[in-house]
Amino acid sequence: MERQNLIEMEGVITESLPNAMFRVHLDNGFNVLAHISGKIRRNYIRILPGDRVKIELTPYDLTKGRITYRLRKR
């Protein structure tokens, strides 16, 4: 599967929803509905509201995304 045309952005988790879905407020001001990628799910990485994350968006639907990385707290 090609991942060349994905848009990668950063944001903050604002709300935790059922079925491992999250509402994310991106740095550019938009809100996105995102799910957890398989590697994060397999490694039991916990994502909570307030965490900064990296998100992949497809150019076809900019309202949904995939959480690929949880950034460390400073």
From Swiss-Prot:
Gene3D superfamilies: Nucleic acid-binding proteins (2.40.50.140). GO terms for cellular component: chloroplast; cytosol. One of its GO terms (molecular function) is translation initiation factor activity. Signal peptide: none annotated. InterPro entries: NA-bd_OB-fold, RNA-binding_domain_S1_IF1, S1_domain, TIF_IF1. The keyword Protein biosynthesis applies. It holds the Pfam family eIF-1a. Residues 1-72 form the S1-like domain. Its main location: plastid. Keywords: Chloroplast, Initiation factor, Plastid, Protein biosynthesis, RNA-binding, rRNA-binding. Belongs to the IF-1 family. HAMAP family: IF_1. One of the essential components for the initiation of protein synthesis. Stabilizes the binding of IF-2 and IF-3 on the 30S subunit to which N-formylmethionyl-tRNA(fMet) subsequently binds. Helps modulate mRNA selection, yielding the 30S pre-initiation complex (PIC). Upon addition of the 50S ribosomal subunit IF-1, IF-2 and IF-3 are released leaving the mature 70S translation initiation complex. Component of the 30S ribosomal translation pre-initiation complex which assembles on the 30S ribosome in the order IF-2 and IF-3, IF-1 and N-formylmethionyl-tRNA(fMet); mRNA recruitment can occur at any time during PIC assembly. This is Translation initiation factor IF-1, chloroplastic. It comes from Mesostigma viride. The gene is infA.
